[in-house]
Amino acid sequence: MKLLVVKDYEEMSEVAAKIFKEVISEKTNAVLGLATGSTPEGLYKKIIEMNRNKEIDFSNIKTVNLDEYVGLGGEDPQSYRYFMNEKLFNHVNINKANTFVPNGLAKDLDEEAKNYDKKVDELGGIDIQILGIGANGHIAFNEPDDFLIAETHVTGLTKTTIEANSRFFKSIEEVPTKALSMGLGQIMKARKIVLLVRGQDKAEAIKGLFKGNITTHNPATMLHMHKDVTVIIDEEMANAIK
Protein backbone atom coordinates (compact mmCIF):
# COMPACT_ATOMS: atom_id res chain seq x y z
CA MET A 1 0.00 0.00 0.00
CA LYS A 2 1.42 3.34 -1.09
CA LEU A 3 0.61 6.51 0.89
CA LEU A 4 0.82 9.91 -0.79
CA VAL A 5 0.50 13.04 1.35
CA VAL A 6 -0.47 16.14 -0.63
CA LYS A 7 -0.95 19.76 0.35
CA ASP A 8 -4.68 20.06 -0.20
CA TYR A 9 -7.74 18.81 -2.09
CA GLU A 10 -6.67 20.54 -5.30
CA GLU A 11 -3.37 18.68 -5.36
CA MET A 12 -5.13 15.44 -4.40
CA SER A 13 -7.38 15.74 -7.44
CA GLU A 14 -4.42 16.63 -9.66
CA VAL A 15 -2.35 13.64 -8.54
CA ALA A 16 -5.27 11.25 -8.95
CA ALA A 17 -5.98 12.60 -12.44
CA LYS A 18 -2.37 12.00 -13.47
CA ILE A 19 -2.63 8.38 -12.32
CA PHE A 20 -5.80 7.94 -14.40
CA LYS A 21 -4.11 9.60 -17.37
CA GLU A 22 -1.24 7.12 -17.19
CA VAL A 23 -3.65 4.17 -17.22
CA ILE A 24 -5.70 5.56 -20.13
CA SER A 25 -2.57 6.45 -22.12
CA GLU A 26 -1.24 2.91 -21.75
CA LYS A 27 -4.59 1.25 -22.51
CA THR A 28 -6.94 3.29 -24.69
CA ASN A 29 -9.85 0.89 -24.07
CA ALA A 30 -9.36 0.74 -20.31
CA VAL A 31 -12.18 -0.09 -17.91
CA LEU A 32 -12.46 2.61 -15.25
CA GLY A 33 -14.08 1.90 -11.89
CA LEU A 34 -15.78 5.09 -10.74
CA ALA A 35 -17.28 6.41 -7.52
CA THR A 36 -19.71 9.16 -6.55
CA GLY A 37 -19.86 11.64 -3.69
CA SER A 38 -18.05 14.92 -3.19
CA THR A 39 -14.52 13.48 -2.92
CA PRO A 40 -13.97 12.45 -6.58
CA GLU A 41 -15.58 15.59 -8.05
CA GLY A 42 -12.24 17.37 -8.25
CA LEU A 43 -10.73 14.39 -10.04
CA TYR A 44 -13.55 14.41 -12.59
CA LYS A 45 -13.04 18.12 -13.25
CA LYS A 46 -9.35 17.48 -13.95
CA ILE A 47 -10.20 14.56 -16.24
CA ILE A 48 -12.70 16.70 -18.17
CA GLU A 49 -10.01 19.37 -18.60
CA MET A 50 -7.52 16.77 -19.85
CA ASN A 51 -10.09 15.45 -22.33
CA ARG A 52 -10.80 18.94 -23.66
CA ASN A 53 -7.07 19.50 -24.08
CA LYS A 54 -6.81 16.24 -26.07
CA GLU A 55 -4.54 14.73 -23.41
CA ILE A 56 -6.83 11.73 -22.98
CA ASP A 57 -9.43 10.15 -25.24
CA PHE A 58 -12.60 8.50 -23.92
CA SER A 59 -13.96 7.17 -27.22
CA ASN A 60 -12.98 3.56 -26.40
CA ILE A 61 -13.17 3.80 -22.61
CA LYS A 62 -15.68 1.81 -20.57
CA THR A 63 -16.74 2.60 -17.01
CA VAL A 64 -18.41 0.76 -14.16
CA ASN A 65 -19.72 2.43 -11.03
CA LEU A 66 -19.61 1.04 -7.53
CA ASP A 67 -23.22 1.47 -6.50
CA GLU A 68 -26.69 2.93 -6.90
CA TYR A 69 -29.59 3.69 -4.59
CA VAL A 70 -32.49 1.23 -4.71
CA GLY A 71 -35.66 3.00 -5.83
CA LEU A 72 -34.03 5.80 -7.82
CA GLY A 73 -33.93 5.84 -11.62
CA GLY A 74 -31.24 7.46 -13.71
CA GLU A 75 -33.35 10.57 -14.32
CA ASP A 76 -33.61 11.27 -10.58
CA PRO A 77 -31.17 14.07 -9.65
CA GLN A 78 -30.19 12.13 -6.51
CA SER A 79 -29.31 8.95 -8.38
CA TYR A 80 -25.71 8.03 -8.97
CA ARG A 81 -26.35 7.60 -12.71
CA TYR A 82 -27.52 11.23 -12.83
CA PHE A 83 -24.48 12.31 -10.79
CA MET A 84 -22.08 10.61 -13.19
CA ASN A 85 -23.77 12.11 -16.23
CA GLU A 86 -23.63 15.60 -14.72
CA LYS A 87 -20.14 15.41 -13.26
CA LEU A 88 -18.33 13.50 -16.00
CA PHE A 89 -20.07 11.67 -18.86
CA ASN A 90 -21.85 14.70 -20.35
CA HIS A 91 -18.52 16.52 -20.65
CA VAL A 92 -16.20 13.97 -22.29
CA ASN A 93 -16.26 12.05 -25.57
CA ILE A 94 -17.49 8.79 -24.06
CA ASN A 95 -20.19 6.55 -25.50
CA LYS A 96 -22.78 6.38 -22.72
CA ALA A 97 -23.63 2.84 -23.84
CA ASN A 98 -20.19 1.98 -22.43
CA THR A 99 -20.96 3.45 -18.99
CA PHE A 100 -22.45 1.04 -16.49
CA VAL A 101 -24.23 1.83 -13.21
CA PRO A 102 -26.41 -0.66 -11.29
CA ASN A 103 -30.13 -0.28 -12.04
CA GLY A 104 -31.82 0.84 -8.83
CA LEU A 105 -35.25 0.28 -10.40
CA ALA A 106 -34.65 -3.34 -11.45
CA LYS A 107 -37.65 -5.58 -10.72
CA ASP A 108 -35.35 -8.37 -9.56
CA LEU A 109 -32.53 -6.73 -7.62
CA ASP A 110 -30.69 -9.97 -6.90
CA GLU A 111 -30.66 -10.79 -10.61
CA GLU A 112 -29.46 -7.25 -11.38
CA ALA A 113 -26.60 -7.76 -8.92
CA LYS A 114 -25.56 -11.04 -10.56
CA ASN A 115 -25.76 -9.52 -14.03
CA TYR A 116 -23.68 -6.54 -12.93
CA ASP A 117 -20.82 -8.76 -11.80
CA LYS A 118 -21.16 -10.71 -15.03
CA LYS A 119 -20.88 -7.48 -17.02
CA VAL A 120 -17.72 -6.42 -15.17
CA ASP A 121 -16.18 -9.81 -15.91
CA GLU A 122 -17.25 -9.63 -19.58
CA LEU A 123 -15.47 -6.27 -19.86
CA GLY A 124 -12.29 -7.96 -18.71
CA GLY A 125 -12.27 -6.55 -15.20
CA ILE A 126 -11.45 -3.10 -13.87
CA ASP A 127 -8.10 -1.54 -14.78
CA ILE A 128 -8.23 1.25 -12.20
CA GLN A 129 -10.75 1.75 -9.40
CA ILE A 130 -11.30 5.07 -7.64
CA LEU A 131 -12.55 4.77 -4.07
CA GLY A 132 -13.68 7.07 -1.30
CA ILE A 133 -14.13 6.04 2.31
CA GLY A 134 -16.91 6.57 4.81
CA ALA A 135 -16.42 7.82 8.36
CA ASN A 136 -16.98 4.25 9.56
CA GLY A 137 -14.55 2.82 7.01
CA HIS A 138 -17.15 1.70 4.50
CA ILE A 139 -16.07 1.21 0.89
CA ALA A 140 -18.89 1.68 -1.64
CA PHE A 141 -21.84 0.54 0.51
CA ASN A 142 -19.92 -2.28 2.16
CA GLU A 143 -20.69 -1.34 5.75
CA PRO A 144 -18.82 -2.59 8.85
CA ASP A 145 -20.15 -6.00 9.85
CA ASP A 146 -19.12 -9.41 11.15
CA PHE A 147 -18.70 -10.51 7.54
CA LEU A 148 -18.49 -8.79 4.15
CA ILE A 149 -20.08 -9.89 0.89
CA ALA A 150 -17.75 -10.44 -2.06
CA GLU A 151 -20.26 -10.00 -4.89
CA THR A 152 -22.50 -7.13 -5.94
CA HIS A 153 -25.51 -7.24 -3.65
CA VAL A 154 -28.48 -5.40 -2.14
CA THR A 155 -27.62 -3.87 1.20
CA GLY A 156 -29.31 -1.79 3.86
CA LEU A 157 -27.65 1.50 4.72
CA THR A 158 -26.57 2.18 8.28
CA LYS A 159 -27.90 5.13 10.25
CA THR A 160 -24.43 6.73 10.06
CA THR A 161 -24.35 6.50 6.26
CA ILE A 162 -27.92 7.74 5.87
CA GLU A 163 -27.12 10.74 8.07
CA ALA A 164 -23.91 11.45 6.13
CA ASN A 165 -25.70 11.27 2.77
CA SER A 166 -28.65 13.37 3.91
CA ARG A 167 -26.68 16.51 3.01
CA PHE A 168 -27.43 15.72 -0.64
CA PHE A 169 -31.20 15.51 -0.02
CA LYS A 170 -33.84 17.99 1.13
CA SER A 171 -34.45 15.93 4.26
CA ILE A 172 -33.12 12.77 5.90
CA GLU A 173 -36.47 11.10 5.21
CA GLU A 174 -35.78 11.27 1.47
CA VAL A 175 -32.52 9.31 1.71
CA PRO A 176 -32.97 5.76 0.36
CA THR A 177 -32.40 3.04 2.93
CA LYS A 178 -31.09 0.42 0.50
CA ALA A 179 -28.55 0.30 -2.30
CA LEU A 180 -27.03 -2.01 -4.86
CA SER A 181 -23.32 -2.16 -4.10
CA MET A 182 -20.33 -3.82 -5.66
CA GLY A 183 -18.85 -6.23 -3.13
CA LEU A 184 -15.32 -6.13 -1.73
CA GLY A 185 -14.39 -9.23 -3.72
CA GLN A 186 -15.21 -7.54 -7.02
CA ILE A 187 -13.50 -4.31 -5.97
CA MET A 188 -10.35 -6.20 -4.99
CA LYS A 189 -10.15 -7.72 -8.48
CA ALA A 190 -9.32 -4.27 -9.89
CA ARG A 191 -5.76 -4.16 -11.17
CA LYS A 192 -5.06 -0.79 -9.55
CA ILE A 193 -6.91 1.02 -6.74
CA VAL A 194 -6.72 4.69 -5.77
CA LEU A 195 -8.31 5.69 -2.45
CA LEU A 196 -9.00 9.41 -1.99
CA VAL A 197 -9.55 10.63 1.56
CA ARG A 198 -11.15 14.00 2.23
CA GLY A 199 -12.65 15.30 5.48
CA GLN A 200 -11.57 15.07 9.10
CA ASP A 201 -14.56 12.86 9.91
CA LYS A 202 -12.59 10.06 8.18
CA ALA A 203 -9.63 10.32 10.60
CA GLU A 204 -10.55 7.35 12.81
CA ALA A 205 -11.15 5.11 9.81
CA ILE A 206 -7.78 6.11 8.33
CA LYS A 207 -6.02 5.56 11.66
CA GLY A 208 -7.50 2.08 11.65
CA LEU A 209 -6.36 1.55 8.07
CA PHE A 210 -2.72 2.33 8.84
CA LYS A 211 -2.39 1.45 12.51
CA GLY A 212 -5.04 -1.18 13.17
CA ASN A 213 -5.63 -4.78 12.20
CA ILE A 214 -7.38 -6.04 9.09
CA THR A 215 -11.01 -6.33 10.16
CA THR A 216 -14.46 -6.49 8.58
CA HIS A 217 -15.47 -3.80 11.08
CA ASN A 218 -13.34 -1.35 9.09
CA PRO A 219 -13.88 -2.53 5.50
CA ALA A 220 -11.14 -0.24 4.16
CA THR A 221 -8.53 -2.39 5.93
CA MET A 222 -9.25 -5.14 3.40
CA LEU A 223 -7.28 -3.04 0.90
CA HIS A 224 -4.08 -4.22 2.60
CA MET A 225 -4.58 -7.53 0.79
CA HIS A 226 -4.41 -5.86 -2.64
CA LYS A 227 -1.08 -5.61 -4.47
CA ASP A 228 -1.49 -2.10 -5.96
CA VAL A 229 -3.26 0.45 -3.76
CA THR A 230 -2.44 4.15 -3.58
CA VAL A 231 -3.97 6.15 -0.71
CA ILE A 232 -3.96 9.92 -1.12
CA ILE A 233 -4.50 12.14 1.93
CA ASP A 234 -3.86 15.81 2.61
CA GLU A 235 -1.49 17.31 5.17
CA GLU A 236 -4.33 18.03 7.59
CA MET A 237 -5.31 14.36 7.63
CA ALA A 238 -1.68 13.28 7.94
CA ASN A 239 -1.34 15.40 11.08
CA ALA A 240 -4.60 14.06 12.48
CA ILE A 241 -3.52 10.41 12.27
CA LYS A 242 0.01 10.81 13.67
UniProtKB/Swiss-Prot annotation:
Disulfide bonds: none annotated. The keyword Cell wall biogenesis/degradation does not apply. This is Glucosamine-6-phosphate deaminase. Pathway: Amino-sugar metabolism; N-acetylneuraminate degradation; D-fructose 6-phosphate from N-acetylneuraminate: step 5/5. Its EC number is 3.5.99.6. One of its GO terms (cellular component) is cytoplasm. One of its GO terms (molecular function) is identical protein binding. Belongs to the glucosamine/galactosamine-6-phosphate isomerase family. NagB subfamily. It catalyses: alpha-D-glucosamine 6-phosphate + H2O = beta-D-fructose 6-phosphate + NH4(+). Catalyzes the reversible isomerization-deamination of glucosamine 6-phosphate (GlcN6P) to form fructose 6-phosphate (Fru6P) and ammonium ion. Keywords: Carbohydrate metabolism, Hydrolase. GO terms for biological process: carbohydrate metabolic process; glucosamine catabolic process; N-acetylglucosamine catabolic process; N-acetylneuraminate catabolic process.
